[in-house]
Protein backbone atom coordinates (compact mmCIF):
# COMPACT_ATOMS: atom_id res chain seq x y z
CA UNK A 1 0.00 0.00 0.00
CA UNK A 2 1.34 3.45 -0.86
CA UNK A 3 2.35 6.07 1.62
CA UNK A 4 0.07 9.03 2.18
CA UNK A 5 1.85 11.27 -0.32
CA UNK A 6 1.92 8.89 -3.30
CA UNK A 7 -0.66 10.77 -5.39
CA UNK A 8 -0.64 14.52 -5.85
CA UNK A 9 -3.44 15.12 -8.36
CA UNK A 10 -6.60 13.46 -9.58
CA UNK A 11 -9.77 12.03 -8.14
CA UNK A 12 -9.72 10.01 -4.93
CA UNK A 13 -12.47 7.67 -3.72
CA UNK A 14 -12.68 6.76 -0.04
CA UNK A 15 -14.53 3.91 1.60
CA UNK A 16 -15.98 3.46 5.07
CA UNK A 17 -16.12 -0.33 5.10
CA UNK A 18 -18.79 -2.17 7.04
CA UNK A 19 -20.20 -5.69 6.96
CA UNK A 20 -23.57 -4.43 5.73
CA UNK A 21 -22.86 -1.05 4.13
CA UNK A 22 -19.93 0.77 2.56
CA UNK A 23 -19.93 4.54 2.60
CA UNK A 24 -18.20 6.20 -0.34
CA UNK A 25 -16.78 9.70 -0.59
CA UNK A 26 -15.01 11.53 -3.38
CA UNK A 27 -12.50 14.30 -3.59
CA UNK A 28 -9.88 15.90 -5.77
CA UNK A 29 -6.35 15.59 -4.48
CA UNK A 30 -5.38 19.08 -5.66
CA UNK A 31 -8.34 20.75 -3.93
CA UNK A 32 -8.05 18.56 -0.82
CA UNK A 33 -11.82 18.64 -0.31
CA UNK A 34 -13.90 15.54 0.37
CA UNK A 35 -17.60 15.12 -0.38
CA UNK A 36 -20.02 12.30 0.45
CA UNK A 37 -20.92 10.33 -2.67
CA UNK A 38 -23.06 7.27 -1.98
CA UNK A 39 -23.69 4.32 0.28
CA UNK A 40 -23.46 0.78 -1.04
CA UNK A 41 -26.16 -0.98 0.95
CA UNK A 42 -25.23 -4.56 0.20
CA UNK A 43 -23.61 -7.29 2.26
CA UNK A 44 -22.77 -9.68 -0.60
CA UNK A 45 -19.29 -9.35 -2.10
CA UNK A 46 -20.12 -9.60 -5.81
CA UNK A 47 -22.79 -6.83 -5.88
CA UNK A 48 -20.54 -4.63 -3.72
CA UNK A 49 -17.66 -4.90 -6.15
CA UNK A 50 -19.99 -4.40 -9.13
CA UNK A 51 -21.12 -1.08 -7.61
CA UNK A 52 -17.53 -0.12 -6.86
CA UNK A 53 -16.56 -0.98 -10.45
CA UNK A 54 -19.30 1.37 -11.68
CA UNK A 55 -17.98 4.16 -9.46
CA UNK A 56 -14.41 3.58 -10.61
CA UNK A 57 -15.50 3.58 -14.25
CA UNK A 58 -17.44 6.82 -13.77
CA UNK A 59 -14.89 8.73 -11.68
CA UNK A 60 -11.54 7.26 -12.81
CA UNK A 61 -9.79 7.68 -9.45
CA UNK A 62 -6.01 7.72 -9.15
CA UNK A 63 -6.15 6.56 -5.53
CA UNK A 64 -8.51 4.70 -3.22
CA UNK A 65 -8.56 5.30 0.53
CA UNK A 66 -10.00 2.74 2.93
CA UNK A 67 -10.83 3.61 6.50
CA UNK A 68 -9.06 1.29 8.91
CA UNK A 69 -11.25 0.46 11.87
CA UNK A 70 -9.36 0.03 15.15
CA UNK A 71 -10.20 0.30 18.83
CA UNK A 72 -9.85 3.72 20.46
CA UNK A 73 -6.44 2.69 21.83
CA UNK A 74 -5.28 1.72 18.32
CA UNK A 75 -5.43 -2.04 18.79
CA UNK A 76 -6.89 -4.09 16.00
CA UNK A 77 -10.07 -6.19 16.03
CA UNK A 78 -12.07 -8.36 13.61
CA UNK A 79 -13.26 -5.46 11.45
CA UNK A 80 -9.65 -4.26 11.13
CA UNK A 81 -8.78 -7.53 9.43
CA UNK A 82 -11.81 -7.21 7.14
CA UNK A 83 -10.87 -3.62 6.24
CA UNK A 84 -7.35 -4.71 5.30
CA UNK A 85 -8.75 -7.57 3.22
CA UNK A 86 -11.17 -5.20 1.48
CA UNK A 87 -8.27 -2.83 0.70
CA UNK A 88 -6.17 -5.67 -0.75
CA UNK A 89 -9.11 -6.80 -2.88
CA UNK A 90 -9.65 -3.28 -4.21
CA UNK A 91 -6.01 -2.92 -5.15
CA UNK A 92 -5.85 -6.38 -6.71
CA UNK A 93 -9.08 -6.11 -8.65
CA UNK A 94 -8.84 -2.54 -9.91
CA UNK A 95 -5.05 -2.04 -10.03
CA UNK A 96 -5.38 1.35 -8.35
CA UNK A 97 -3.18 2.23 -5.36
CA UNK A 98 -4.94 1.95 -2.00
CA UNK A 99 -4.07 3.86 1.15
CA UNK A 100 -5.35 2.99 4.61
CA UNK A 101 -6.51 5.81 6.88
CA UNK A 102 -7.48 5.81 10.54
CA UNK A 103 -11.24 5.90 10.83
CA UNK A 104 -11.62 6.17 14.59
CA UNK A 105 -14.68 8.21 15.59
CA UNK A 106 -15.77 8.95 12.01
CA UNK A 107 -19.22 7.45 12.55
CA UNK A 108 -19.63 9.45 15.76
CA UNK A 109 -18.62 12.62 13.89
CA UNK A 110 -20.96 11.79 11.00
CA UNK A 111 -23.87 11.20 13.38
CA UNK A 112 -23.17 14.53 15.08
CA UNK A 113 -23.03 16.38 11.75
CA UNK A 114 -26.37 14.90 10.71
CA UNK A 115 -27.97 15.76 14.05
CA UNK A 116 -26.76 19.36 13.69
CA UNK A 117 -28.74 19.66 10.45
CA UNK A 118 -31.81 17.98 11.93
CA UNK A 119 -31.39 14.47 10.54
CA UNK A 120 -31.94 12.02 13.38
CA UNK A 121 -32.71 8.38 14.04
CA UNK A 122 -33.42 6.09 11.10
CA UNK A 123 -33.24 9.00 8.66
CA UNK A 124 -29.48 9.01 9.23
CA UNK A 125 -28.94 5.47 7.95
CA UNK A 126 -28.72 6.22 4.19
CA UNK A 127 -26.23 9.06 4.75
CA UNK A 128 -24.22 8.04 7.80
CA UNK A 129 -21.63 5.84 6.12
CA UNK A 130 -20.94 8.19 3.21
CA UNK A 131 -20.44 11.09 5.61
CA UNK A 132 -18.09 8.90 7.65
CA UNK A 133 -16.23 8.18 4.38
CA UNK A 134 -16.10 11.93 3.75
CA UNK A 135 -14.38 12.42 7.11
CA UNK A 136 -11.96 9.58 6.39
CA UNK A 137 -11.01 11.22 3.10
CA UNK A 138 -10.82 14.73 4.52
CA UNK A 139 -8.52 13.50 7.28
CA UNK A 140 -6.40 11.74 4.66
CA UNK A 141 -6.13 14.98 2.65
CA UNK A 142 -5.33 17.05 5.74
CA UNK A 143 -2.63 14.65 6.94
CA UNK A 144 -1.08 14.15 3.50
CA UNK A 145 -0.93 17.93 3.01
CA UNK A 146 0.64 18.43 6.43
CA UNK A 147 3.25 15.76 5.62
CA UNK A 148 4.28 17.45 2.37
From Swiss-Prot:
E.C. number: 3.1.-.-
InterPro entries xrefs: RNaseH-like_sf (IPR012337), YqgF (IPR005227), YqgF/RNaseH-like_dom (IPR006641), YqgF/RNaseH-like_dom_sf (IPR037027)
Single biological process term from Gene Ontology: rRNA 5'-end processing
Keywords: Cytoplasm, Hydrolase, Nuclease, Ribosome biogenesis
Domain of life: Bacteria
Hydrolase listed as a keyword: yes
Annotated compartments: Cytoplasm
A cellular component annotation (GO) from this entry: cytosol
CDD domains: YqgF
Pfam family, one: RuvX
A GO molecular function held by the record: nuclease activity
Stored HAMAP family: Nuclease_YqgF
Family in the record: Belongs to the YqgF nuclease family.
Main function: Could be a nuclease involved in processing of the 5'-end of pre-16S rRNA.
Protein name per Swiss-Prot or TrEMBL: Putative pre-16S rRNA nuclease
Lineage, broadest ranks: Bacteria, Pseudomonadati, Pseudomonadota, Betaproteobacteria, Nitrosomonadales
